[in-house]
Amino acid sequence: MESQGYAFARTARVAALAGALLLMAAGLAAQPSVQKIIDYIDTNYEVRSDMTAQARITTKDPDQGTKVIESVYYRRDRDDAFLIVIAEPETDRGNGYLRVGDNMWMYRRNTRTFTHIGRDEKIGGSNASAGDIETRKFKELYKPSVDSSGREILSEETLGGAKIPVYRLEVVAKVNDVKFPKLVMWVTRDKYLELKRESYSLSGTLLETSYFTNYKEVEGRYVPLLWKFVDEVEKGRTSLFEIIGIAFEKVEDYMFDKKYLETLSK
């Protein structure tokens, strides 16, 4: 009887262990890969039509105070061209940023000159850059980061006081023309919306922390209407990028031309 009882207990322990392993395996199988999460993010951010948006950038600097920039953003879908026209403050009115093809320019009204710029050019002196406005696909720019054993760096966490269920993942650049070579991202587990991002240098120094909130569903896609950029190098410096109004209507081709920006200055 004792041997039978021992055998029964051992069988029960083995069954319990097997069940736990099966549950763990099921959980691992249900967890998407980092690449799959990146694909979901690309799908969410994908815009399939021309777009016009009113945007406000509020930059707070401990030395220079607060600056508010009002602008209008135009995007042409067929070639991903975009135009940003500054409306306020008065000192910057008529300045702009134009991207057509692989070329990007900054226009200054007071000198009526165009300067060829890179994706890391800051818009109006804020922490938001020209590259942040582009709609380049994540999968074309970044790849999953792996640990010493070759496994993707991916975990399940909760974020913020609301304890939002998120995936925490790490990616590294696979092209050279990106603003940051390494990113750590927090993405919701249900709709794959990016809520937080930490941006690092090659040496592993944290350079910027970004937050994406106030998502709005538009034509089956989700657009963050509020972006916050926290400068981790210049402490106390932050930029808030707000989309005030957004419309998906055709934008005329003549607007994506240097001549159009010049006419606004007359």
Task: Locate the predicted segments by residue.
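Bacterial N-terminal signal peptides that target proteins for export
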Residues: 2-17
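Bacterial Sec-dependent signal peptides at the C-terminal "C-region" and cleavage site
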Residues: 26-32
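A short, amphipathic edge element
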Residues: 35-36, 135-153, 204-209
